């Protein structure tokens, strides 16, 4: 009976010493038990190491245990296993309920207890109390002595939570910390380990409970040997001493044996021998000794074992690591299992490491736990509850359906059904009660109901069948979950819903079988483990809180809190693979080569300073009062220092330290102080970078097949551009050509070099087939011609190939335009029927008629989007205000005008009144233009008839002569030309152009420095909604448009002003009759030019660019054309900024005439 301490710095062979002693004992045929105790996370690795060192005899004669396994053995042998051990899930769920029940009586934690994450913090504090033997009695004594009021209140509330938790827990359970307390009790009367020889390895400190267990073992065992990582024993220590934590542990152990009267069998100093791990490596031995030595010594010998690499970013960093690993394996005969990669936060590096290592064909295992929240089963459960608690939203429904756990929707066919369903749901705004109703709408308009075809009826019938299959079990689940129930009842309902109603558990079994058959071990493990975790959490919840009454949302909170405590460990899929992990989890286990990545300031060592519920100051006060708890943040800084020291002493032969200059988000980063320290203690080490590498490897770019192919592509590109490349690339190229798997890819590379996204013209025959209607005519609108002028390729995709966007149930700008136009047209018809004149309309008339028209429109179309929600009801009221304001302005404009409204919604190409505009092309084909004019006004003056076209717009628009010249704004001139050409049929005599104007439909917000009178408001509104466009430069005609226009004034309703002399002021909106004629000629020639290009199959990727306005910014097809202005062949069609007089001159030159823009 006695304690022996085996000590030495990192790499001195402490673990190997223990294993060798066990091996020696086994060789001598021991009669007593041989036990090696290590931390829980190292049991598997240690078992492997012992098995490799000793062989099968180890299994019969020795055991590798953790304290947890030790307790399990004692309870099984000597009793104590009567109460179930509660896992972290049950513990967290119980704490949640305790906090809920105590919440209103709390002061300090009342608000915090409802915050996400507080349960974990509270759980850690309870665990800490138990680890450090803080019980109710200790808390009472300490609280009475605390003078700090805030800490006193905090401790009183913590005591209440602690006591309530223990009271409920001990009704039938113990937690893991109680295990050690129970183990202490049981060891007193248990002879299981009497006479055993015990080694305790890999611990830097022990909790009070663990120390108590060690004390009990010391009394019963033949010997207890404990390893400690220390430079020297019985030496003075300061808090900055690298080994302060282990020296404190040594002190506690010595105090323990003195108090218990146990013999001390002395020290074994492994520092006296040559470092076991670094005996063949001077540089690594020097790092171990001098990394934290003050003052330090320098090593000026040759450096072969340490590399420092400064990476541009994380991708460059990991690619360097991958290439170097392959170099070690190929040239130095390393095995992948001899290599480890470690960092401070493996989560940050997981994705980039996985991607690059896969590319370089490096087998690897990431030693980390993964969150189960994204597993399909957990998503399925949460989204099922979200569906019924959040009113059947689109997001929750399709999360639920896309998990793949409903058997009807598995596989490709199931996915296609979901896609079809999703398209309908998005197009028709299905949510809430609409899921419970039969779907009958299949109209293309979101504002009006339409007749549907037989084909669409069949689609609807199929969709309704799918809907029924989805809704029926969910609706039943919803009804069962109404109101408050016990947690046990909710658990039963949920499990029956999953297992009996939907066969989800059976579906998971099928997935597991499929994954196993296809060598997908990780996926198979995830699916069956998460299912078992869910069942376990459900059972724990029932055991702990089964009789608690709650509603569905509270039940899901409890369940998710339990599930959140579980993380799933990944399993190694091969024996020979690179080990990747956090520095806190990876220990030296035959690691010949080590890569420490992400060695940046604030990252390694970590700068994290989370205090938890108890601050550093609180802990100091409690320590003064006799309560010793876990480390404060200051102590953790020095513990982090020891962690770094441990990490840098893992490698046996080769160490690589890397850091990126920028993080994953592109933010700059500095190297860690460790990098500077390494440069000081090893002055001969040279820092490498992408442009400077010490390892002379002219074949560095030849690595794994895929990255080598990428490098080959770059080399081929250089050669294609005339640059010199290394000779070996032709042999690499030949190798890929000989390999069937890669030959096709090489061909793609070659084609890629010749690739251009420029499109060849399609044939005239193909263009006709694409653009002709079912009557073999090419009929189109002016807006489509303008679209072609913007970009021929976009037109080809939209109107030739008939590409369509996914239909979404939303009110878009075109929908708004259609709605406003329709109401204005109905308004005009209404006042005609009532024999009212525009000029006689009052504000009340306007409001009443508009309200009635809008209400009828919405009422008569039940499926209209304006009936779908309160939000759209608000929009409807807003539309009423806008339309009312607009018709009032139109009324005022008509009062001030001698022009009269002749017709609304005048169609050409759709009626007998106005024929389509026929465009005869030079090549012999004909195009037919159809359109609809919002409003035509007429004026009879001095025996002549003048026509004025008004185009309603929901946004601001002015006539731009430059856009017109380039075919981007032709519509009003085309309409005018059609009217003038057909005027004898329309107005029964030849008419002349009076104006083409835009009217903005709006209820403008007025800006003013002070209050305005009613008259001033009226004037400001008229100014804001002034008609914009071109007017005939004739004072009589202009005066007829605004009969209030007087000499020396500006019109409030049209873009014109009158000089004091009575003639019109200079204004680019005023053009002569000859100029109107010129524009009409030009627009016809421009349309013919556009149509000729269209029929000839020109589909150039040539988007227009005017100043900063680029057509591509609003194009839905940019991902198809892949236009890139940086490519040599990709060019914008630039619309240069020109003066109006220069444009008039160009128009003159194109169509003839002597009219200028002056």
Swiss-Prot record:
Biological process according to GO: double-strand break repair via homologous recombination
Stretch forming the signal peptide: none
Coiled coil location: none
Enzyme class: hydrolase
Record EC number: 3.1.-.-
Keywords from the named record: 4Fe-4S, ATP-binding, DNA damage, DNA repair, DNA-binding, Exonuclease, Helicase, Hydrolase, Iron, Iron-sulfur, Metal-binding, Nuclease, Nucleotide-binding
Record bears the keyword Hydrolase: yes
Cofactor note: Binds 1 [4Fe-4S] cluster.
Residues the entry annotates as binding ATP: 8-15
Domain of life: Bacteria
Molecular function GO labels: 4 iron, 4 sulfur cluster binding; 5'-3' exonuclease activity; ATP binding; double-stranded DNA binding; helicase activity; metal ion binding
Assembly: Heterodimer of AddA and AddB.
Something else known: Despite having conserved helicase domains, this subunit does not have helicase activity.
Family indicated by similarity: Belongs to the helicase family. AddB/RexB type 1 subfamily.
Name of the protein in question: ATP-dependent helicase/deoxyribonuclease subunit B
Organism listed in the record: Clostridium perfringens (strain ATCC 13124 / DSM 756 / JCM 1290 / NCIMB 6125 / NCTC 8237 / Type A)
Gene from which this protein is expressed: addB
